[in-house]
Curated annotation (Swiss-Prot):
SMART domains: Arg_tRNA_synt_N, DALR_1. Belongs to the class-I aminoacyl-tRNA synthetase family. It holds the Pfam family DALR_1. PANTHER family: ARGININE--TRNA LIGASE, CYTOPLASMIC (PTHR11956:SF5), ARGINYL-TRNA SYNTHETASE (PTHR11956). Keywords: Aminoacyl-tRNA synthetase, ATP-binding, Cytoplasm, Ligase, Nucleotide-binding, Protein biosynthesis. It is found in: Cytoplasm. It is an enzyme of class 6 (ligase). NCBIfam families: argS. It catalyses: tRNA(Arg) + L-arginine + ATP = L-arginyl-tRNA(Arg) + AMP + diphosphate. Monomer. It comes from Paraburkholderia xenovorans (strain LB400). This is Arginine--tRNA ligase.
Length: 596
């Protein structure tokens, strides 16, 4: 149901319920408390288009039989001026549900709405004026992005688009963990490669990174190459094998550039990159620790500084500063979230792997301990589970590029049709391969709820049939493009006139099912935004593509028919479907191809 129709029906029902309730209890209008009118789609299509349980809500306070009350509401509703424009039939079901069937005209109205709003169909300004920071990916600059980062990138970018579709001002942020032990390990690994060592050689660091990318960094460092991340200053290799700090700076810049390339191939952009090292340079970490000490939220024990996280729901207190004077990893996270708050982001969503679950209570406890007005439950978290990559029925655990894990770029290239084992730079692979791979990876990685484990099947991603969900959806769009092109050629049809076509011939069961699904798009986007559930978009697109294919494959619904009225109405329906498919695909960062 279109949002405008939903609002009208809610108003009609509210007025009707008030009328029936006042007549039933003889109370004054001033004393009447209106119940919440909730409209839902019945689980069984045969039960109608809209269901409402308001009679069951009111039965007890009105001391009425819910079925009898529901019938009174139905009778009064159908007598309301304008109700028959929307409601074709109404009936009472079960213990007192009110099931409504919409008129054909109400369902057909979605076509005009789509033509009028085009790429904005489904969008609203409901949440205009609200600001949200979404932090996602946030990888250590110690190697290429792995498939877990890819799931974060797909989820974060799609969620950003979903929230923006409802008017949110979305700030996308990537937090670089460019300080700490792992960065030191990166520097030592690169230094070892620069000295000519390889994994397994005598003198190779015990915890070093073994991927071939480390050898590439060392080679460029020794050659005096210049590298820079998209937001960073250029860094030139100093060629000095003994200068560990110069090696560290070069290696971090090199890998930040590599991660930029991964994100570019994935079609994901950020508004800001925030460096962990800046928290130390600006004194934010020390300031945060000092504030917690001053607030009485810490204590010394066995030479370490502890935070009283149990005061705010953690299962035990946590060490903040170790005996060697260094901070545990959650301390800069607390300082970082103070910075988010001070920048005015009262709504923050972090998308992280489920292995970060233990840090949530610690970060929130630290923020509460500061007593600076940050609400409990800040920030929000979306935790995703792991991704397993399968090919030829077997799990793929390593790649040449990373050495110990499958990278995002591997996944994009393989899903686009590149030969496994022939990994090369993105700019050396044809654009169509990257597009196909990006589309498959992005669609697949948001096609399940974040809190479920995901098996990414490379063989399935390469299939060009209905088993492949992204192909199934994209083919629906391309198929419609082909039909409309054929209509233009065969009947000299002017596509710009479709908005004025008479769509009243669209009365069949298949047509109505497709119209209903189109009208669900705005509500689906609002629900996805409210529930922070971008997977809902992928679910919807599969369902919409299914309704289209069912309609188009029905011989009774042939589009290329001699009857101009029927043909034009069906073409208008297809054109509206094409637009909604394109809108949904754009929301999750997937292309809508014209031909396949």
């Amino acid at each position: 149901m279109l949002p405008a129709h939903k609002h009208t029906l809610e108003t009609l029902l509210a007025d009707t319920v008030k009328q029936v309730a006042l007549a039933s209890q003889g109370a004054s209008e001033a004393a009447f408390v209106s119940p919440t009118i909730t409209l839902e789609r019945p689980k069984v299509a045969a039960h109608g288009d809209v269901a409402c349980n308001v009679a069951m809500q009111l039965a007890k306070p009105l001391r009425a039989n819910p079925r009898q009350l529901a019938q009174q509401i139905v009778d009064a509703l159908l007598a309301q001026p304008g109700a028959r424009d929307l409601v074709e039939a109404a009936e009472v079901a079960g213990p007192g549900f009110i099931n409504l069937r919409l008129t054909a005209a109400a369902k057909q109205a979605v076509i005009a709405a789509v033509f009028a709003e085009k790429e904005r169909f489904g969008r609203s300004q409901r949440d205009a004026g609200k600001h949200v920071l979404i932090e996602f990916v946030s990888a250590n600059p110690t190697g290429p992005l792995h498939v877990g980062h890819g799931r974060q990138a797909a989820l974060g970018d799609a969620l950003s688009n979903v929230l923006a579709s409802q008017g949110w001002d979305v700030h996308r942020e990537f937090y670089y963990n460019d300080a700490g032990v792992q960065i030191q390990t990166l520097a030592l690994s690169t230094q070892a490669r620069a000295r000519g060592l390889a994994p397994g050689d005598e003198g190779w660091p015990a915890s070093a990174y073994n991927g071939e990318y480390i050898a590439d960094i060392a080679k460029d460092y020794l050659n005096g190459a210049t590298v820079a991340a998209s937001d960073g200053e250029p860094v030139t290799g100093a060629r000095d094998v003994e200068d560990l700090e110069a090696i560290r700076r070069f290696a971090v810049a090199y890998l930040r550039r590599e991660q930029d390339m991964d994100l570019q191939a994935f079609g994901v952009k950020f508004d800001q990159y925030y460096l962990e090292s800046s928290l130390y340079k600006e004194g934010r970490v020390e300031k945060t620790v000092a504030a917690l000490i001053a607030a009485g939220k810490t204590y010394e024990q066995e030479g370490a500084l502890w935070l009283r996280t149990t005061d705010d729901g953690d299962d035990k207190d946590r060490v903040m500063r170790k005996t060697d004077g260094t901070y545990t990893y959650f301390v800069p996270d607390v300082a970082y979230h103070v910075a988010k708050w001070e920048r005015g982001f009262t709504k923050v969503i972090n998308i992280q792997g489920s292995d970060h679950h233990g840090t949530i209570a610690r970060v929130r406890a630290g923020l509460q301990g500061l007593g600076i007005g940050i609400p409990k439950g800040y920030p929000d978290y979306i935790l995703h589970k792991m991704v397993t990559v399968m090919r030829n029925g077997e799990e793929v655990k390593i790649s040449k590029r990373a050495g110990s894990y499958v990278t995002v770029r591997d996944l994009i290239e393989w899903s686009g049709g590149a030969t496994p084992g022939s990994e090369v730079d993105v700019d050396l692979i044809d654009e169509e391969t990257i597009r196909r791979g990006r589309d498959a990876v992005r669609f697949f990685l948001i096609s399940r709820k974040a809190d479920t484990e995901f098996v990414f099947d490379i063989d399935l991603a390469l299939k060009q049939n209905d088993e492949n969900p992204v192909h199934y959806v994209q083919y629906a769009h391309a198929r419609i493009c082909s039909v409309i092109a054929e209509c233009k050629a065969r009947y000299n049809m002017d596509e710009s006139t479709l908005a004025d076509v008479d769509v009243t011939p669209l009365t069949s069961e298949r047509a109505m099912a497709l119209l209903n699904k189109l009208a669900e798009f705005p509500d689906m986007l609002q629900h996805a935004a409210d529930e922070l559930a971008p997977h809902a978009v992928a679910f919807y697109l599969r369902d919409l593509a299914g309704e289209f294919h069912s309609f188009y494959n029905d011989k009774a619904e042939r589009v290329l028919v001699d009857d101009a009225a029927e043909r034009n109405a069906r073409v208008a329906l297809l054109a509206a479907t094409r637009q909604v498919l394109a809108n949904g695909l754009a929301t999750i960062g997937v292309s809508a191809p014209v031909k396949m």
